[in-house]
Amino acid sequence: MDNLKRKHHRALVQVFFFILINYIYIDRELSLGKNLIPLLNEYAIKTISPIQGVEYFYTFITKEVFTRDFLFPSLIIMSTVCILGIFFGPVLCGWVCPLGSFQDLLSRLGQKLFKDKYDNFIKPTLDKNLRFLRMISLLIVLSALIFKITDVGKYDPAKAMYNIFVGKFETAGLIVLLITTVLSLFIRRPYCRYLCPYGALVGYSNLIRIFTIRRNPDKCSGCNKCNEACPMKLYPGKEQQTRDVQCISCLECTSEQQCPHEKALDFSVKIGKKTIKMPFSVLFAIVLCIVLGAILITSTFAYWPFLKESLY
């Protein structure tokens, strides 16, 4: 029973942020001004969108916009993304991103429709080659920003998804969103796996993250349950440690989720001979508190009028 409850932790976080982020966009676009949730605006949310997130990183690093209302929120957001990445990898992708949550929801429908055939329509060799498109996508977005092509955000499917709720439709982003929707019925997280530039950027945190997915060969029976559970179709059951840049730190493969063998696969850090495990419930609380706290603090700075003056 306890294990069943644990399986819902990530889903609860995903639903919470999906509703929260869409509310923020709706409130901004329709200017509701009702302050149902005080001190919230779109400043912090831009780092979660696939293309806008890369734009935000680029703008912060190059200081293209250097005003106080941008600087302070940016410092908080960048610190949050980096700290979470260094400790846990791209948990924003696996736990917070609304577009990722939307694809996860569609994957459940796809699994019911196609059963064992789901996510097995593409041959492994082709799947491996298609994953390079994600890096190409990142390079295209960065090139567009360098050459001052300012409308690159119109291709962002997450932005298109938010805008649907307020009756705004950008053709380019909507087309990408529709393609993602259809493909999600056949493939798990197709946009995350093959095209997301933001995922390509933050995915490199897997190479340096302190806590990582570790397999205990003595406990592992090779049942393949962990590999089947991975939404990015990685193979944690074949590795001593999972440091693939496509891992989204969802922990669906671990012994607390899908693996039937206790301590066979966990999220931990090894210090000398001692292994410190990160329980699923603790990561649940950390992600929820840190991300929500960053949004609240960021929005507080953005709401202070005197911080909107230019630094120069």
Predicted regions and their residues:
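Short, solvent-exposed linear patches
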Residues: 250-252
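Non-ligating segments of multi-cofactor redox enzymes
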Residues: 1-228, 232, 236-239, 245, ...
